[in-house]
């Protein structure tokens, strides 16, 4: 048996075990990390040589879910794992975002961390353990790394914080918060919440940071025993003579180029100055060094103006929002639409409503099987005036869409209140920063324009950060793209007037203090109120009527014991209803039936069929049915779907009838009255009392009158 190094802790009342040396022994570093009965294999491999022609850290983090982990066989034709699920992509981003700032920017060797979920107890989410596992293999490896980090999930249930809540606990939690932090600072925050107040959110982040310390202690213990000697950080210095020459050439001109409020004018001015600079110095210095030095001059100009003058490069104040505009009812025919504009950033959001049958089917390790609310974010290259490949959404688009989706979920009506599947598409048509928060604003308005009865409007804002010497800093409201590029943080907060619904924090520095976190959260609250004021002017309440082009959903309730009658053998009956009426039919286990139709007549037709299928035949009631069979003694009539009664020959007319066929034939419609339901549940009908209401129906025993002729027996001849 292969021996392994094993390290244990008890975290949140469950056992955490990290082992190394048993699996993936050819990787540069590898561990398994198990929390309760959820287990992941985490590996790190690094290229031996730097990659040529790159000016960034080539880090790739792949998060892979194995369906066997939960005892499942993958769906689809080939029955094997294919492209990562949306949840897997988000889990990969959750790991990448906090680790990247802690690795040297100068590192050019390819790094690949693969996180594979190999066991899932369906109670504990694996995503945060991917973060802890990735941090552990980096700490063990020879890669320079300013970690380790701890990652904790925090719930808020009945006024108490819960460390690493289970899926079941999250159902009743007001908060789903993930915090990643080093020993001293927070490096990543991600949260979804049900309008949590700002002070509770800050306390939850502090609670998580304290919980992370035990995970950091554990990784330090592993590193002390198994860690390799770290490689030196590569030195990528710009020659001093280049920096001096560039600074002298652009002195005073960089601030002038950056001062344009219009994004296009600003970019043209910056690029024009760059072209002049390269033309003047390229014969003396390498172009790459010139461009790197110029980039540093731009960064210095942006940051110094903010820190020293409290003014941003385009003249805006530290807390000043860009020009805002909101519009609804933008497009014809669609179910709901809105456009939200913030400076040069524009997001158009379209709402489409469908039946619950159109919910997304999830094939992954998440606790949910279906999803009735989807927000899809698209970022077209024309939004930045560029020519790029346009294709399927990447990780960034999926992440931005998930954030906006998370921000809106707390205000959505329940399926019982609004039995629709809701799809939102947020199309970015102009981008100068903060498109994800623009998507929240436009999507909130689009839902209201579609008549979705959301509880409140939701707005989002990004808060940036500029840090200086001696722990000085400045938080800035509503960052533009250039401030995001050259700043230190993107602190996104979405919420209503009553609290926070989502947070996502990314940073380029190696962590932020709680003073910065508090300033950012309260600064975002002030800005959010101002944005909601503008949104309210466009549309303050959801429309009371749906679009005439949206499907209508009608809800009825049936006896749960009659569900089988509606579905039929192998679904035959319900398929027939859908085909006959051109509707959709969803049935819940409690007997709730939701019928979706494009017109009222189709819905009413489907409702009548379902009600007839589940209705009990009552004595004295009158029905119009169809003749299904004819016997010598009478006719059988289907008076409700699948339910027959018999009209005796003497009850077919108000005169003597010689042959049943003289009055009715198979397929004829006939109105009858239920005159008796005998002790065996058989239904006797009369057409005679319909023709003559004063006629008295005859009660008869049908035991001697079988529904179908019986087989010939010798005794029949002797009785004749």
From Swiss-Prot:
Residues 551-610 form the KH domain. Its cofactor is Mg(2+). InterPro entries: ExoRNase_PH_dom1 (IPR001247), ExoRNase_PH_dom2 (IPR015847), ExoRNase_PH_dom2_sf (IPR036345), KH_dom (IPR004087), KH_dom_type_1 (IPR004088), KH_dom_type_1_sf (IPR036612), NA-bd_OB-fold (IPR012340), PNPase (IPR012162). Mg(2+) binds at residues 484, 490. It catalyses: RNA(n+1) + phosphate = RNA(n) + a ribonucleoside 5'-diphosphate. GO terms for molecular function: 3'-5'-RNA exonuclease activity; magnesium ion binding; polyribonucleotide nucleotidyltransferase activity; RNA binding. Its EC number is 2.7.7.8. It is an enzyme of class 2 (transferase). GO terms for cellular component: cytosol. Residues 620-688 form the S1 motif domain. Keywords: Cytoplasm, Magnesium, Metal-binding, Nucleotidyltransferase, RNA-binding, Transferase. Residues 697-720 are annotated as: Disordered. It is found in: Cytoplasm. GO terms for biological process: mRNA catabolic process; RNA processing. PANTHER family: POLYRIBONUCLEOTIDE NUCLEOTIDYLTRANSFERASE, POLYRIBONUCLEOTIDE NUCLEOTIDYLTRANSFERASE 1, MITOCHONDRIAL. Involved in mRNA degradation. Catalyzes the phosphorolysis of single-stranded polyribonucleotides processively in the 3'- to 5'-direction. HAMAP family: PNPase (MF_01595). Belongs to the polyribonucleotide nucleotidyltransferase family. This is Polyribonucleotide nucleotidyltransferase. It comes from Dehalococcoides mccartyi (strain CBDB1).
